[in-house]
Amino acid sequence: MSTPNVTARVETWLSSTWHVKVPLTWLEACINWIQEENGGGNLSQAQISRQVFEQWLLTDLRDLEYPILPDGILDAPKGELSGFYSLQIDSLLDVSQPAYSQLQKIRGKSTVNEEVTANTQAFQKPWEAKPTRMLMLQLTDGIHQIQGMEYQPVPVLHSNLPPGTKITVHGNVAYRLGVLLLKPENVKLLGGEVDALLEEYSQERVLARLLGEAENPDSVRQPGHEQIVPGPVDELGQTLGPSDEELLASLDENNDFILNNETSLESGYCSRSNNFSATSCSLTTYNENTTGFPLQQESVNLLPRSDEQTPPSVEYNDAFLNDFPLEDDILLEEEIQRELEEVPSVARNGNVNLSTERIPHTYRSSCGSSLNETSEKDDGCGSEKPVEVTSKQKNLARTVSTGDGTSTGGSLQCNSVSQACSSAIVLLKNPHEERRNDLGPDESSCQSRHAPDSRQLNKDPVSSSKTDPEADQQAILCRPGNACDLDLDSPPFTYISLLLAKKPETITLVKVKCFIVTLTGNLTSSNGSWGIKAKVSDGSAYLEVDFADDILTSLIGFSVPEMHTLRKDPALQPKLKDGLERCQKQLIDLCCLMTIEFNPFQSKATVLILQDTDARHLEQLKKRLNK
């Protein structure tokens, strides 16, 4: 059989069977080499054709310099590719996973932290779509360099394919800006590899270049590269829920709307964070006989999340409130300084000792600091028992004690002691000192009620140029005040810590100035009423509360019966969504006066009324402070 006839038949076989096109000069040289390698023996046409195809699989298409892709494909912003194109994969990366964790895994380093992703978190619901693998391929036909994106999962592709693997792209393939959008029906894996590319385009080197790290000169072939024709690999499937129409039709009277705020540990109050869309509070609904399904495709953000990912929790320590801005601290310290100037000295025969343990540099006195106060005192001039002020904040311990001596010249005013206690709580001006304010017995003496000593507790001045009246008003409304002089009905508001300390035995109505720390329950619609549980704080303590139906109805814009009417009409469904988003926006920075009904029998508190602060409340607070 003559060589030209063999060459023509091999060319036809490659084109018809594998859709492979090669230059004639390379094909003739390849056939001659095969015949020489076999000692000039008589090989059948099928054997020659097969060996030529195997040599093509091991050849770098750049050496052939034979264009396959149409001219101008890289210049057109979009288009569609039709036909059969045999291309070479230089490299590929899984862009759905962090490049750093992939590189650490290849290098055999610990990737425990990197493996903690949204896919491994307990709060991910079974109906939520899981991350899908997306491979980005660097392709070439020997002349043109083009990218291929795994637009839909392609089972025949995987990240361990060796550089130089050949594939056939066929059918109608859309492309955008030089990127082929590959689907499973568009890709056929032929196999092969190119030894010269194994080192340059190894996974480790490609990832290192992507991260800007130094490449490892000793990088070797990755495990699995020996497989020329890989088998199918598992793909990450997506669990798709029912349509919006089916979900709305499944709602009944006892649906629970779940506000997934497990990852939200920070409210918008006293926070300058601009990342109000960080927390995804998915609005979902539960059916009586099934697990939950999403009510809407969109998620509703109810509370902004802190910049750091934090595990879900409903228990908080006081360190959480230390993240408030320094600007608020300065405003508070101005008011603290004014209070200290008004405090008369503690008139007693004995000594006043203030001992401060080493305070962490990161601690700042703020309106969010939560301190537990325990004090025992007499109304008259009898001896005062020690007053202890403790905090849950680690490394912070302060004891204020008045001596055991007896009075020699009159009685000691109760408010003097209480103001001294309140001052001692926040007298943390210089955290760098290990010990301070050690007053001897001669520094504080007992005087008559009508002739108080002019000496005051030793204190450091606090300087600030803040003179904004609105900021001063906010600072005054935020300060804890003198718990010893307050009652649960003191205008304009009282404090949660005082409510918890007094432990009322009957149902009590109190007014406090609070903000939402986090949502601890689900938005529910039961028996024709809205309901949601939350944890609120006024800076002195936390309190678990339920929000009344009237409040939620006003925030959402419609009642539960109206909601059932809206869901029946598809045209009114946007109104349902808008109402929930309206509720979200108002909850983000909710900080106002709350009238709370405290029920000691059920250990339950319910927010009945929301009220904004005004000038009248400020005047009431000033009068209370000036008493």
From Swiss-Prot:
GO molecular function: nucleotide binding
Localisation: Nucleus
Record's compositionally biased regions (Low complexity): 399-411
Compositional bias annotation for Basic and acidic residues: 374-387
Keyword annotations: DNA replication, Nucleus
Claim: Nucleus is one of the keywords in the record: yes
Polar residues: compositionally biased ranges: 363-373
Tagged with keyword Iron-sulfur: no
Family annotation (Gene3D superfamilies): 2.40.50.510, RecQ-mediated genome instability protein 1, N-terminal domain, RecQ-mediated genome instability protein Rmi1, C-terminal domain
Chain positions covered by the region annotation Disordered: 362-412, 432-472
GO (cellular component) term, any one: RecQ family helicase-topoisomerase III complex
GO biological process, one term: double-strand break repair via homologous recombination
Functional note: Essential component of the RMI complex, a complex that plays an important role in the processing of homologous recombination intermediates to limit DNA crossover formation in cells. Promotes TOP3A binding to double Holliday junctions (DHJ) and hence stimulates TOP3A-mediated dissolution. Required for BLM phosphorylation during mitosis. Within the BLM complex, required for BLM and TOP3A stability.
Oligomeric and partner information: Component of the RMI complex, containing at least TOP3A, RMI1 and RMI2.
Family of the protein in this entry: Belongs to the RMI1 family.
Protein name: RecQ-mediated genome instability protein 1
